[in-house]
């Protein structure tokens, strides 16, 4: 274990090594990062979280620092869908400036309080500046997040037009070089697999079931006997099965997992949606063409089905269910009818090579996630300008140092955008502060970024700062770092 200044320095070194690899991807003139793979061609990407997840440092203590910032990137991606590189850049700036002051004798606890105070004020400002989105704004946000690719921006805007802003958009690889949209019937609800052993795609930790039977149980299931016939049928016909239940007995779940691992049973068990459970279950039953599986009704009489089901750690998506919802939708309120009637837009991504396909999928995924964040909370001026215009709270003592650390860190995103474009960061930042204009790094012009369509989702801008400040505060107040005991090699 290590203590005091040495502990913080080693953590900082790890933060810097990871952040330096990630931040080269920021902005319209950001660079690619080439990542070695275990098998096949290297992965080329501008996706910050992909880069962050690929960095491993030999020094254990430095790697702990890198892991802390890696978590910032991952959490920002999970919370807001984008902004992973911005969060990393902000975290690095706060850590470096903060540790200078801690080393000089400032109280780290008071510095952290000042940082938290500043972040609270800034996030309220970001919320107040947010503009609701329309389809033109959606296209602009998607274009910027896709590394300023207007074709991808238009593609995603078209997808949302087809299924509305409350609809579902997913992505798959095309069988050709063309990239196109297909709208199918389906729905999505918040839930996840009950065990990671159900995962079939370890690249994105998802479970994909082709042409599965769907069984919906609005109750706890605890007796394997009532499902034996269906499970045997699935095993014999090599058919997948998706089970949705309110609760599952641990022994029953273990039995299904063992059959999944040892016997290749294509099964996944998910918990019923928590939010508006009864409504959502009714919709699932209608879409899949099944019935509720009760203790009185034989399970085989209750099965529905769909063309495909995708289960991630956050959502379950059912595509092209076997049910006919035409009459069912007529009796629903507008919100539910829109959710079911809108369907699912699938973007099939095509490219000329596997390397190009992987890079393009990264950019489209970023664009979809950023667009969803913009729909949630609106948009603000991009290019780092919203951070520079944010007001700061008054503070005294070492808390004032914390506020000033955040003030300086707020320059970091625009500074990095400029450096990636080999532009004079100090001059550009000074002019943005002096005027009401922002800097468009793509055209290298000062202009009204809202009118120019240079927009960032407010949710991304807010979440990136909150997560960066949170982990930076932890590093500043760290006094000891302990590494795991090394297991002796046999």
Feature names for model-found ranges:
Residues 3, 9-11, 56-63, 261, ...:
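Extended, low-charge hydrophobic alpha-helical regions
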């Amino acid at each position: 274990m290590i203590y005091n200044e040495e502990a913080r320095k080693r953590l900082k070194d790890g933060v810097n090594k990871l952040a330096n690899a990630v931040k080269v991807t920021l902005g319209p003139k950001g660079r690619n990062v080439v990542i070695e793979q275990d098998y096949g061609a290297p992965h080329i990407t501008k996706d910050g979280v992909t880069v962050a997840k690929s960095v491993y440092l030999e020094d254990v203590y430095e790697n702990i620092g890198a892991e802390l910032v890696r978590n910032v990137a991952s959490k920002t991606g999970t919370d807001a869908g984008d902004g992973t590189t911005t969060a990393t850049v902000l975290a690095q700036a706060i850590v470096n400036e903060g540790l200078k002051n801690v080393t000089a004798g400032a109280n780290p606890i008071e510095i952290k309080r000042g940082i938290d105070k500043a972040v609270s004020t800034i996030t309220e400002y970001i919320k107040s500046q947010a503009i609701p989105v329309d389809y033109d704004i959606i296209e602009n946000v998607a274009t910027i997040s896709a590394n300023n690719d207007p074709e991808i921006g238009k593609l995603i805007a078209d997808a949302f037009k087809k299924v509305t802003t409350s609809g579902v958009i997913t992505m798959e690889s095309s069988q050709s070089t063309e990239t196109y949209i297909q709208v199918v019937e389906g729905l999505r609800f918040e839930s996840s697999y009950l065990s990671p052993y159900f995962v079939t795609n370890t690249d994105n930790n998802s479970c994909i079931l082709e042409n599965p039977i769907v069984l919906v149980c609005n109750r706890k299931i605890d007796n394997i006997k009532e499902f034996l016939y269906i499970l045997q049928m699935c095993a014999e016909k090599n058919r997948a099965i998706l089970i949705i239940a309110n609760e599952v007995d641990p022994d029953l779940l273990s039995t299904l997992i063992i059959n999944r691992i040892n016997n290749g049973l294509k099964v996944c068990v998910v918990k019923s949606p928590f939010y508006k459970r009864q409504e959502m279950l009714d919709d699932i039953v209608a879409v899949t063409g099944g019935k509720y599986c009760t203790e009185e009704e034989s399970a085989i009489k209750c099965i529905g089905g769909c063309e495909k089901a995708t289960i991630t750690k956050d959502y379950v998506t059912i595509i092209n269910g076997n049910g006919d919802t035409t009459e069912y939708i007529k009796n629903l309120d507008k919100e539910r009818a829109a959710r079911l009637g809108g369907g699912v837009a699938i973007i099939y991504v095509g490219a000329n090579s596997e390397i190009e396909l992987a890079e393009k999928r990264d950019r489209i995924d970023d664009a979809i996630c950023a667009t969803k964040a913009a729909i949630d909370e609106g948009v603000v001026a991009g290019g780092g300008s919203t951070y520079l215009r944010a007001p700061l709270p008054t503070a005294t003592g070492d808390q004032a140092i914390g506020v000033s650390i955040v003030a300086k860190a707020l320059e970091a995103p625009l500074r990095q955008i400029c450096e990636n474009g080999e532009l004079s960061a100090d001059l550009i930042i000074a002019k943005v502060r002096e005027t009401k204009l922002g800097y468009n790094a793509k055209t290298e012009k000062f202009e009204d970024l809202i009118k120019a369509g240079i927009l960032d989702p407010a949710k991304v801008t807010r979440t990136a700062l909150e997560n960066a400040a949170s982990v930076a505060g932890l590093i500043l107040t760290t006094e000891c770092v302990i590494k795991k005991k090394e297991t002796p090699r046999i």
